[in-house]
Protein backbone atom coordinates (compact mmCIF):
# COMPACT_ATOMS: atom_id res chain seq x y z
CA UNK A 1 0.00 0.00 0.00
CA UNK A 2 2.93 2.37 0.72
CA UNK A 3 4.33 1.70 -2.74
CA UNK A 4 0.91 2.37 -4.30
CA UNK A 5 0.58 5.69 -2.47
CA UNK A 6 4.01 6.76 -3.70
CA UNK A 7 3.49 5.61 -7.30
CA UNK A 8 -0.19 6.45 -7.86
CA UNK A 9 -1.11 10.14 -7.69
CA UNK A 10 -4.56 11.83 -7.96
CA UNK A 11 -3.19 13.96 -10.78
CA UNK A 12 -2.82 10.84 -12.92
CA UNK A 13 -6.57 10.19 -12.80
CA UNK A 14 -7.47 13.85 -13.24
CA UNK A 15 -5.38 14.14 -16.40
CA UNK A 16 -6.77 10.90 -17.86
CA UNK A 17 -10.39 11.80 -17.18
CA UNK A 18 -10.20 15.53 -17.88
CA UNK A 19 -11.30 15.08 -21.51
CA UNK A 20 -13.28 11.86 -21.16
CA UNK A 21 -16.41 13.42 -22.69
CA UNK A 22 -14.51 14.86 -25.65
CA UNK A 23 -13.48 11.47 -26.99
CA UNK A 24 -10.65 10.70 -29.37
CA UNK A 25 -10.03 12.29 -32.76
CA UNK A 26 -12.27 9.81 -34.59
CA UNK A 27 -15.16 10.47 -32.20
CA UNK A 28 -14.82 14.25 -32.56
CA UNK A 29 -14.99 13.98 -36.38
CA UNK A 30 -18.49 12.50 -36.24
CA UNK A 31 -21.01 15.12 -37.36
CA UNK A 32 -23.95 15.61 -35.02
CA UNK A 33 -26.73 18.12 -34.53
CA UNK A 34 -26.49 20.40 -31.51
CA UNK A 35 -29.41 21.34 -29.30
CA UNK A 36 -31.31 20.66 -26.09
CA UNK A 37 -33.33 17.80 -27.59
CA UNK A 38 -32.42 14.92 -29.87
CA UNK A 39 -32.84 15.64 -33.58
CA UNK A 40 -34.51 12.49 -34.93
CA UNK A 41 -33.32 11.33 -38.34
CA UNK A 42 -36.46 10.10 -40.10
CA UNK A 43 -34.34 8.20 -42.64
CA UNK A 44 -32.55 6.09 -40.03
CA UNK A 45 -33.51 2.41 -39.93
CA UNK A 46 -31.77 1.90 -36.58
CA UNK A 47 -33.20 4.67 -34.39
CA UNK A 48 -36.67 6.21 -34.67
CA UNK A 49 -38.85 8.22 -32.32
CA UNK A 50 -41.11 5.62 -30.67
CA UNK A 51 -44.86 6.02 -31.03
CA UNK A 52 -45.92 5.02 -27.51
CA UNK A 53 -47.49 8.42 -26.79
CA UNK A 54 -48.50 9.56 -30.27
CA UNK A 55 -52.22 9.08 -29.60
CA UNK A 56 -52.11 11.16 -26.42
CA UNK A 57 -51.00 14.57 -27.64
CA UNK A 58 -52.31 17.26 -25.29
CA UNK A 59 -55.37 15.21 -24.37
CA UNK A 60 -56.28 14.55 -20.77
CA UNK A 61 -55.41 10.98 -19.80
CA UNK A 62 -58.66 9.04 -19.48
CA UNK A 63 -59.52 6.11 -17.25
CA UNK A 64 -58.69 2.66 -18.58
CA UNK A 65 -61.47 1.69 -20.97
CA UNK A 66 -63.24 -1.69 -21.04
CA UNK A 67 -62.43 -4.10 -23.86
CA UNK A 68 -65.48 -4.33 -26.10
CA UNK A 69 -65.83 -6.79 -28.98
CA UNK A 70 -62.09 -7.39 -29.26
CA UNK A 71 -60.72 -9.71 -31.90
CA UNK A 72 -58.31 -12.53 -31.14
CA UNK A 73 -54.85 -12.00 -32.64
CA UNK A 74 -53.35 -15.34 -31.61
CA UNK A 75 -54.14 -18.63 -29.88
CA UNK A 76 -50.85 -19.87 -28.46
CA UNK A 77 -49.73 -22.93 -26.52
CA UNK A 78 -47.64 -23.52 -23.40
CA UNK A 79 -44.19 -22.10 -22.60
CA UNK A 80 -44.31 -19.18 -25.02
CA UNK A 81 -41.01 -17.42 -24.31
CA UNK A 82 -40.10 -13.77 -24.68
CA UNK A 83 -37.98 -14.86 -27.66
CA UNK A 84 -41.09 -16.32 -29.30
CA UNK A 85 -42.84 -13.00 -28.68
CA UNK A 86 -39.95 -10.71 -29.65
CA UNK A 87 -37.08 -12.53 -31.39
CA UNK A 88 -33.59 -11.06 -31.25
CA UNK A 89 -32.14 -13.05 -34.16
CA UNK A 90 -31.69 -12.36 -37.86
CA UNK A 91 -34.33 -10.60 -39.95
CA UNK A 92 -35.68 -12.61 -42.87
CA UNK A 93 -36.17 -10.90 -46.23
CA UNK A 94 -39.76 -12.18 -46.57
CA UNK A 95 -40.80 -11.04 -43.07
CA UNK A 96 -42.75 -7.81 -42.36
CA UNK A 97 -39.57 -6.31 -40.86
CA UNK A 98 -37.59 -7.38 -43.93
CA UNK A 99 -40.15 -5.76 -46.23
CA UNK A 100 -39.94 -2.55 -44.21
CA UNK A 101 -36.14 -2.46 -44.48
CA UNK A 102 -36.26 -3.23 -48.21
CA UNK A 103 -38.69 -0.32 -48.76
CA UNK A 104 -36.20 1.86 -46.89
CA UNK A 105 -33.45 0.85 -49.35
CA UNK A 106 -31.55 -1.51 -47.05
CA UNK A 107 -29.93 -4.49 -48.77
CA UNK A 108 -30.73 -7.90 -47.28
CA UNK A 109 -27.10 -8.47 -46.29
CA UNK A 110 -27.36 -5.35 -44.13
CA UNK A 111 -30.61 -6.26 -42.37
CA UNK A 112 -28.70 -7.30 -39.25
CA UNK A 113 -30.76 -8.59 -36.30
CA UNK A 114 -33.82 -7.51 -34.35
CA UNK A 115 -31.57 -7.03 -31.33
CA UNK A 116 -29.38 -4.54 -33.19
CA UNK A 117 -32.41 -2.60 -34.43
CA UNK A 118 -34.24 -2.43 -31.11
CA UNK A 119 -34.03 1.37 -31.32
CA UNK A 120 -36.50 1.34 -34.22
CA UNK A 121 -40.06 0.54 -33.14
CA UNK A 122 -41.10 0.09 -36.78
CA UNK A 123 -38.81 -2.93 -37.01
CA UNK A 124 -39.58 -4.27 -33.55
CA UNK A 125 -43.37 -4.16 -33.80
CA UNK A 126 -43.14 -5.97 -37.13
CA UNK A 127 -41.00 -8.57 -35.39
CA UNK A 128 -43.46 -9.15 -32.55
CA UNK A 129 -44.77 -12.75 -32.62
CA UNK A 130 -42.62 -13.26 -35.74
CA UNK A 131 -40.34 -16.00 -34.40
CA UNK A 132 -40.30 -18.82 -36.96
CA UNK A 133 -40.86 -21.35 -34.13
CA UNK A 134 -44.12 -19.86 -32.89
CA UNK A 135 -47.33 -21.65 -33.84
CA UNK A 136 -50.60 -19.77 -33.87
CA UNK A 137 -53.49 -22.23 -33.71
CA UNK A 138 -55.67 -19.74 -35.57
CA UNK A 139 -53.66 -20.75 -38.64
CA UNK A 140 -53.11 -24.53 -38.25
CA UNK A 141 -50.19 -26.02 -40.13
CA UNK A 142 -48.21 -22.76 -40.23
CA UNK A 143 -45.08 -21.61 -38.41
CA UNK A 144 -44.06 -18.07 -37.61
CA UNK A 145 -46.09 -14.91 -37.17
CA UNK A 146 -49.18 -15.93 -39.12
CA UNK A 147 -52.83 -15.42 -38.17
CA UNK A 148 -56.29 -15.35 -39.70
CA UNK A 149 -57.98 -11.96 -39.95
CA UNK A 150 -61.60 -11.81 -38.84
CA UNK A 151 -64.21 -11.66 -40.18
CA UNK A 152 -62.56 -11.88 -43.61
CA UNK A 153 -60.83 -15.16 -42.60
CA UNK A 154 -57.86 -14.15 -44.77
CA UNK A 155 -54.53 -15.62 -43.68
CA UNK A 156 -51.83 -12.99 -43.25
CA UNK A 157 -48.94 -11.96 -41.02
CA UNK A 158 -49.77 -11.01 -37.43
CA UNK A 159 -48.42 -7.51 -38.10
CA UNK A 160 -50.57 -6.99 -41.21
CA UNK A 161 -53.65 -8.24 -39.36
CA UNK A 162 -52.94 -5.85 -36.46
CA UNK A 163 -52.74 -2.94 -38.92
CA UNK A 164 -56.07 -3.95 -40.48
CA UNK A 165 -57.70 -4.08 -37.05
CA UNK A 166 -56.20 -0.69 -36.15
CA UNK A 167 -57.91 0.87 -39.18
CA UNK A 168 -61.29 -0.05 -37.70
CA UNK A 169 -60.15 0.75 -34.12
CA UNK A 170 -60.73 -2.86 -33.10
CA UNK A 171 -59.05 -3.84 -29.79
CA UNK A 172 -57.09 -7.09 -29.70
CA UNK A 173 -56.42 -9.88 -27.22
CA UNK A 174 -54.01 -12.81 -27.19
CA UNK A 175 -54.73 -16.21 -25.63
CA UNK A 176 -52.01 -18.56 -24.39
CA UNK A 177 -51.40 -21.61 -22.21
CA UNK A 178 -49.12 -22.11 -19.22
CA UNK A 179 -45.89 -20.19 -18.46
CA UNK A 180 -46.50 -17.33 -20.86
CA UNK A 181 -43.48 -14.98 -21.11
CA UNK A 182 -40.76 -17.29 -19.78
CA UNK A 183 -37.13 -16.62 -20.67
CA UNK A 184 -35.15 -13.40 -20.54
CA UNK A 185 -36.86 -10.21 -19.35
CA UNK A 186 -37.04 -8.77 -22.87
CA UNK A 187 -38.76 -5.39 -22.71
CA UNK A 188 -39.78 -5.44 -26.37
CA UNK A 189 -41.92 -8.52 -25.75
CA UNK A 190 -44.29 -6.19 -23.89
CA UNK A 191 -43.66 -3.04 -25.95
CA UNK A 192 -44.29 -4.78 -29.27
CA UNK A 193 -47.43 -6.42 -27.92
CA UNK A 194 -48.83 -3.01 -26.95
CA UNK A 195 -47.89 -1.38 -30.26
CA UNK A 196 -49.80 -4.07 -32.14
CA UNK A 197 -52.94 -2.95 -30.31
CA UNK A 198 -53.20 -5.83 -27.83
CA UNK A 199 -55.14 -4.77 -24.72
CA UNK A 200 -54.98 -8.02 -22.75
CA UNK A 201 -53.19 -11.36 -22.66
CA UNK A 202 -55.28 -14.21 -21.25
CA UNK A 203 -53.20 -17.23 -20.21
CA UNK A 204 -53.18 -20.17 -17.81
CA UNK A 205 -50.12 -18.74 -16.02
CA UNK A 206 -47.49 -16.01 -16.47
CA UNK A 207 -43.79 -15.53 -15.86
CA UNK A 208 -43.44 -12.85 -13.18
CA UNK A 209 -41.17 -10.31 -14.91
CA UNK A 210 -42.95 -10.39 -18.27
CA UNK A 211 -46.28 -10.08 -16.46
CA UNK A 212 -44.96 -6.93 -14.76
CA UNK A 213 -43.68 -5.58 -18.10
CA UNK A 214 -47.12 -6.07 -19.66
CA UNK A 215 -48.69 -4.05 -16.83
CA UNK A 216 -46.11 -1.32 -17.36
CA UNK A 217 -47.16 -1.06 -21.02
CA UNK A 218 -50.87 -1.00 -20.20
CA UNK A 219 -51.59 -4.58 -21.28
CA UNK A 220 -53.74 -6.46 -18.75
CA UNK A 221 -52.40 -9.92 -17.76
CA UNK A 222 -55.49 -12.02 -17.02
CA UNK A 223 -55.38 -15.64 -15.89
CA UNK A 224 -57.85 -18.46 -16.44
CA UNK A 225 -59.39 -20.10 -13.39
CA UNK A 226 -57.83 -23.43 -12.44
CA UNK A 227 -58.72 -26.01 -15.06
CA UNK A 228 -59.88 -23.52 -17.71
CA UNK A 229 -58.06 -22.82 -20.97
CA UNK A 230 -58.81 -21.46 -24.41
CA UNK A 231 -58.61 -25.02 -25.76
CA UNK A 232 -61.26 -26.28 -23.29
CA UNK A 233 -63.45 -23.34 -24.27
CA UNK A 234 -63.03 -24.50 -27.89
CA UNK A 235 -61.96 -21.11 -29.21
CA UNK A 236 -60.98 -20.97 -32.88
CA UNK A 237 -60.24 -17.24 -33.23
CA UNK A 238 -63.53 -16.22 -34.83
CA UNK A 239 -64.98 -15.08 -31.49
CA UNK A 240 -65.34 -11.55 -30.13
CA UNK A 241 -64.14 -10.86 -26.58
CA UNK A 242 -65.58 -8.35 -24.09
CA UNK A 243 -63.97 -7.68 -20.70
CA UNK A 244 -65.59 -5.15 -18.34
CA UNK A 245 -64.22 -3.57 -15.18
CA UNK A 246 -60.66 -2.84 -16.32
CA UNK A 247 -60.95 0.72 -14.99
CA UNK A 248 -61.29 -0.64 -11.45
CA UNK A 249 -58.89 -3.57 -11.79
CA UNK A 250 -57.12 -4.51 -8.56
CA UNK A 251 -54.48 -7.13 -7.71
CA UNK A 252 -55.88 -10.67 -7.99
CA UNK A 253 -59.39 -9.38 -8.62
CA UNK A 254 -61.87 -11.70 -10.31
CA UNK A 255 -63.15 -10.30 -13.59
CA UNK A 256 -65.61 -11.59 -16.15
CA UNK A 257 -64.93 -12.24 -19.83
CA UNK A 258 -67.78 -12.62 -22.30
CA UNK A 259 -67.08 -14.73 -25.40
CA UNK A 260 -69.39 -13.93 -28.31
CA UNK A 261 -69.29 -16.84 -30.70
CA UNK A 262 -69.92 -16.68 -34.43
CA UNK A 263 -73.45 -18.11 -34.17
CA UNK A 264 -74.51 -15.65 -31.49
CA UNK A 265 -74.05 -17.86 -28.42
CA UNK A 266 -72.34 -16.14 -25.51
CA UNK A 267 -70.12 -17.80 -22.92
CA UNK A 268 -69.16 -16.09 -19.64
CA UNK A 269 -65.82 -17.00 -18.07
CA UNK A 270 -64.22 -15.84 -14.82
CA UNK A 271 -60.64 -14.60 -15.03
CA UNK A 272 -58.15 -13.52 -12.38
CA UNK A 273 -56.28 -10.22 -12.53
CA UNK A 274 -52.54 -10.93 -12.31
CA UNK A 275 -51.61 -7.37 -11.45
CA UNK A 276 -49.62 -7.75 -8.23
CA UNK A 277 -47.33 -4.82 -7.44
CA UNK A 278 -46.91 -2.28 -4.66
CA UNK A 279 -45.18 1.03 -3.95
CA UNK A 280 -44.48 1.76 -0.27
CA UNK A 281 -43.86 5.35 0.80
CA UNK A 282 -44.26 7.74 3.74
CA UNK A 283 -46.84 9.76 1.79
CA UNK A 284 -48.30 10.03 -1.73
CA UNK A 285 -49.28 12.92 -3.98
CA UNK A 286 -53.02 12.43 -4.70
CA UNK A 287 -52.99 12.33 -8.52
CA UNK A 288 -49.96 10.05 -8.70
CA UNK A 289 -51.55 7.76 -6.10
CA UNK A 290 -54.63 7.54 -8.32
CA UNK A 291 -52.46 6.83 -11.38
CA UNK A 292 -50.72 4.00 -9.53
CA UNK A 293 -54.05 2.41 -8.68
CA UNK A 294 -55.16 2.81 -12.29
CA UNK A 295 -52.09 0.85 -13.40
CA UNK A 296 -52.69 -1.87 -10.82
CA UNK A 297 -49.91 -0.77 -8.46
CA UNK A 298 -50.95 -0.78 -4.80
CA UNK A 299 -49.91 2.44 -2.96
CA UNK A 300 -49.10 1.45 0.63
CA UNK A 301 -48.14 3.98 3.30
CA UNK A 302 -45.90 3.58 6.34
CA UNK A 303 -47.43 4.17 9.77
CA UNK A 304 -46.66 7.57 11.30
CA UNK A 305 -42.97 7.72 12.18
CA UNK A 306 -41.94 4.68 10.13
CA UNK A 307 -39.77 4.78 7.01
CA UNK A 308 -37.47 2.47 5.08
CA UNK A 309 -34.50 4.35 6.55
CA UNK A 310 -35.67 3.76 10.13
CA UNK A 311 -36.15 0.10 9.30
CA UNK A 312 -32.53 0.09 8.07
CA UNK A 313 -33.30 -1.49 4.72
CA UNK A 314 -30.40 -1.87 2.31
CA UNK A 315 -32.11 -3.61 -0.63
CA UNK A 316 -30.99 -7.15 0.19
CA UNK A 317 -34.26 -7.99 1.95
CA UNK A 318 -37.22 -9.99 0.65
CA UNK A 319 -40.68 -8.45 1.08
CA UNK A 320 -43.95 -10.34 1.59
CA UNK A 321 -47.33 -8.59 1.63
CA UNK A 322 -50.46 -10.70 1.98
CA UNK A 323 -54.05 -9.67 1.38
CA UNK A 324 -53.61 -7.52 -1.74
CA UNK A 325 -56.46 -9.42 -3.41
CA UNK A 326 -58.93 -8.08 -0.82
CA UNK A 327 -57.45 -4.60 -0.35
CA UNK A 328 -59.87 -1.85 0.69
CA UNK A 329 -59.40 1.94 1.10
CA UNK A 330 -57.39 2.82 4.22
CA UNK A 331 -57.18 -0.83 5.26
CA UNK A 332 -54.31 -1.81 7.54
CA UNK A 333 -52.10 -4.48 6.00
CA UNK A 334 -48.99 -6.26 7.22
CA UNK A 335 -45.61 -6.39 5.49
CA UNK A 336 -43.02 -9.01 6.45
CA UNK A 337 -39.37 -8.10 5.87
CA UNK A 338 -37.10 -11.12 5.54
CA UNK A 339 -33.55 -10.00 6.17
CA UNK A 340 -30.39 -11.61 4.84
CA UNK A 341 -29.55 -13.36 8.12
CA UNK A 342 -33.01 -14.87 8.49
CA UNK A 343 -34.47 -12.35 10.92
CA UNK A 344 -38.01 -11.27 10.08
CA UNK A 345 -39.56 -7.89 10.84
CA UNK A 346 -43.31 -7.25 10.70
CA UNK A 347 -44.48 -3.74 9.79
CA UNK A 348 -48.00 -2.31 9.56
CA UNK A 349 -48.89 -0.40 6.40
CA UNK A 350 -51.96 1.57 5.35
CA UNK A 351 -53.75 1.03 2.03
CA UNK A 352 -53.98 4.32 0.10
CA UNK A 353 -56.18 3.08 -2.75
What are these regions (language model features)?
Residues 1-353:
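Fe-S-dependent hydro-lyases/dehydratases of central metabolism
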Amino acid sequence: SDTARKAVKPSMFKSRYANVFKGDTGWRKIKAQKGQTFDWNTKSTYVQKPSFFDDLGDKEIKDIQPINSARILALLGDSITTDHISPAGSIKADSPAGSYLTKNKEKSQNFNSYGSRRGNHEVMMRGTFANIRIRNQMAPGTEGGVTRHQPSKKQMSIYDAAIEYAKSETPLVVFAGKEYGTGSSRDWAAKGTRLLGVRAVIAESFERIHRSNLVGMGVAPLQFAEGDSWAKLKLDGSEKITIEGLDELKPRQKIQMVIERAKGRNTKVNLLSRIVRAVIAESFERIHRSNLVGMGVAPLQFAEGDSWAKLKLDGSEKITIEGLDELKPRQKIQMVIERAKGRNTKVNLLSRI
